[in-house]
UniProtKB/Swiss-Prot annotation:
<dbReference type="Pfam" id="PF05746">
    <property type="entry name" value="DALR_1"/>
</dbReference>
<protein>
    <recommendedName>
        <fullName>Arginine--tRNA ligase</fullName>
        <ecNumber>6.1.1.19</ecNumber>
    </recommendedName>
</protein>
<comment type="subunit">
    <text>Monomer.</text>
</comment>
<keyword id="KW-0436">Ligase</keyword>
<keyword id="KW-0963">Cytoplasm</keyword>
<dbReference type="InterPro" id="IPR036695">
    <property type="entry name" value="Arg-tRNA-synth_N_sf"/>
</dbReference>
<dbReference type="GO" id="GO:0004814">
    <property type="term" value="F:arginine-tRNA ligase activity"/>
</dbReference>
<dbReference type="Pfam" id="PF00750">
    <property type="entry name" value="tRNA-synt_1d"/>
</dbReference>
<dbReference type="InterPro" id="IPR014729">
    <property type="entry name" value="Rossmann-like_a/b/a_fold"/>
</dbReference>
<dbReference type="InterPro" id="IPR001278">
    <property type="entry name" value="Arg-tRNA-ligase"/>
</dbReference>
<dbReference type="InterPro" id="IPR001412">
    <property type="entry name" value="aa-tRNA-synth_I_CS"/>
</dbReference>
<dbReference type="Pfam" id="PF03485">
    <property type="entry name" value="Arg_tRNA_synt_N"/>
</dbReference>
<dbReference type="InterPro" id="IPR005148">
    <property type="entry name" value="Arg-tRNA-synth_N"/>
</dbReference>
<dbReference type="GO" id="GO:0005524">
    <property type="term" value="F:ATP binding"/>
</dbReference>
<keyword id="KW-0067">ATP-binding</keyword>
<dbReference type="GO" id="GO:0006420">
    <property type="term" value="P:arginyl-tRNA aminoacylation"/>
</dbReference>
<comment type="similarity">
    <text>Belongs to the class-I aminoacyl-tRNA synthetase family.</text>
</comment>
């Protein structure tokens, strides 16, 4: 149950009954401090101002008609007109009981939408690097959350599998195949292969002529070029899949929807834009001038959709992409997890899409932009030599560092188990370190913080789960076979249950805002509340069996909530660390 939403509806009804205009926002929020209750309604002051009445007097009118029977134990007016709402222990206990009995932990499914999520999008014939990490794991966490809420989600891995560079790549692949007969080993170092192809193109004119010829042949559907192109795509995606699998990312080859997929749509789209009078010729190119965007002279900005040589641009592909996702995938909502530097480019493409009538306003096109991963020097994260960090190398180093950490803490565990723990902690640390930061900000990549067992980190959260699970293993009990009822008799119990009941609010916030850090913040707060509860409220050695059973239920619900929350982030838990 979403308690915030429930109370918001109740306060909205009371506002209207007290004389507020219909649809006035109740603005119910979780209270920042316990002294202000569990929730606070902040909408009264805005309404009172519009009505020209005293906010505290209007707040009292709202309270007089506010029906929170069976939900709140107390309400009060605070400050200039805030309404503080304190949930009743009986209500919280009842909700906790229901959540524990439900495999979804009380989280309701939403009305299903068709949602397309565009994320990861590496380039063919290049290895994934750290720059691909944020899109990949942020997108995947949001997708998992949307699916948990019952939505039909199409994962779209918009790989860079088209362009003039494929001429030189195909020419080099052909050269290797003629010389060695087998290419798979040669392509194990994709970056090296790409650099070699570029060097040959720049230095060998005969090679360059062949390469340019292959660009034309590939675009016209030549069988040999198509076969070579497919080989490059296949080898690249096999390597990318290793990274996805290591990171516990749910993308597969079936989710690939590369740039090439939209090739047949590009010429008809330009023709249609011309027909509608949106695209006009300018210096030999086809250009759409947008009043919404001005150049430095204050004139409408021109967006090229076809070059004078007949070639198309990324913008043309993005127009086709949005059109396809609406017309063929029936999208109600399209989420793009793309670097913030691409924002204007996307906005321009979508402006054209709307003007041309390809995607109606009822379909939400959303750019979930993100900042950069920086080194400790505050610059883009690089190798010591100043090169781009390969994602596979980053994950290898994470595993090595985690293995040392686990060895120091648990020397006596079997080697196989230590290796499993190290791998799980390493991947979790890399992901959580990123996901716990606000998506739109740049962040400093720091191994020490990432692998720390204190603070809002993956090791801390994984250990928090293990700590709760160990209560049951010590007692030889199953979390699913507990008896008795949840009874709240202590302030620490109430604080823990109130936080547990905010899980659905966190899930829905991640889904609507595309912000996984909200789930990380929630789980970290929950772990903190459990710590306070655990220190103040004895569980296994409690002499009152009813209290013991109730607290075991709260511990079980905490463990299940942490596990489910981490699963939505694509992070695995461990039964022991």
């Amino acid at each position: 149950m979403n308690i915030q939403s429930l109370i918001n509806d109740k306060v909205s009804q009371a506002l209207e009954a007290a004389g507020a205009p219909a649809g006035s926002p109740a603005a119910v929020r979780q209270s920042a401090k316990a002294q202000f209750g569990d929730y606070q309604a902040n909408g009264v002051m805005g309404v009172a101002k519009r009505l020209g009445t005293n906010p505290r007097e209007f707040a009292q009118k709202v309270l007089d008609v506010l029906d929170l029977d069976g939900i709140a134990s107390k309400t009060e007016i605070a400050g200039p007109g805030f309404i503080n709402i304190f949930l009743s222990e009986e209500f919280l206990a009842k909700q906790a009981e229901a959540a524990l009995a439900d495999k979804r932990l009380g989280v309701a499914k939403e009305e299903q939408q068709n949602i397309v999520a565009d994320y990861s999008a590496p380039n063919v014939a290049k290895e994934m690097h750290v720059g691909h990490l944020r899109s990949t794991i942020i997108g995947d966490a949001v997708v998992r959350t949307l699916e948990f809420l019952g939505h039909n989600v199409t994962r779209a891995n918009h790989i860079g599998d088209w362009g003039t560079q494929f001429g030189m790549l195909i020419a080099n692949l052909e050269r290797i195949q003629k010389e060695k007969g087998e290419v798979s080993m040669e392509l194990s170092d994709l970056e090296g292969f790409y650099r070699e192809s570029k060097k040959l193109y720049d230095e060998d004119e005969e090679f360059a002529v062949t390469a340019r010829g292959y660009v034309v042949k590939l675009q016209s559907g030549d069988e040999f070029c198509a076969e070579m192109w497919k080989k490059l795509v296949d080898v690249t995606m096999v390597q990318n899949q290793r990274n996805y699998d290591r990171l516990n990312v749910s993308l597969t080859r079936d989710n690939v929807m590369g740039e090439s997929m939209y090739n047949s749509m590009l010429a008809p789209i330009v023709a249609d834009l011309q027909k509608q009078g949106l695209a006009v010729e300018s210096e030999g190119a086809q250009v759409v001038f947008l009043d919404e965007y001005k150049n430095k002279d204050g004139e409408p900005m021109g967006v090229i959709v076809q070059k004078r040589d007949g070639g198309f641009l990324y913008t043309t592909t993005d127009i086709a992409c949005a059109k396809y996702r609406y017309e063929e995938l029936n999208a109600d909502r399209v989420l793009y997890f793309i670097d913030s530097r691409q924002h204007q480019h996307l906005m321009q493409a979508w402006t054209i899409v709307r003007k041309a009538g390809y995607v109606p306003e009822s379909v939400s096109l959303e750019h979930h932009a993100f900042g950069m991963m920086l080194g400790k020097d505050g610059r883009p994260f690089k190798t010591r030599a100043g090169g781009t960090v390969r994602l596979a190398d980053l994950l290898d180093e994470a595993e090595e560092r985690a293995a040392k950490l686990i060895e120091e803490k648990n020397k006596d565990l079997p080697a196989e188990e230590k290796a499993k723990i190290a791998t799980t902690v390493a991947m979790a640390a890399v992901k959580y370190s990123d996901l716990s930061k606000h998506r739109t900000t740049d962040y400093i990549f720091d191994w020490d913080n990432m692998l720390a067992f204190e603070g809002n980190t993956a090791p801390y959260m994984q250990y928090a789960y293990t700590r709760v699970a160990s209560i049951f293993s010590k007692a030889g009990l199953s979390m699913d076979e507990l008896t008795g009822e949840v009874k709240i008799t202590d302030e620490k119990e109430k604080a823990l249950v109130a936080k547990l009941m905010q899980f659905e609010e966190a899930v829905q916030a991640v889904a609507s805002e595309g912000q996984p850090h909200l789930m990380c913040a929630y789980l970290f707060e929950l772990a903190g509340q459990f710590s306070s509860f655990y220190e103040a409220c004895p569980i296994l050695n409690n002499e009152d069996d009813a209290v013991k059973q109730s607290r075991l239920k709260l511990a079980a619900l905490t463990a299940k909530t942490i596990k489910q929350g981490l699963e939505l982030l694509g992070i695995e838990t461990l039964e022991r660390m």
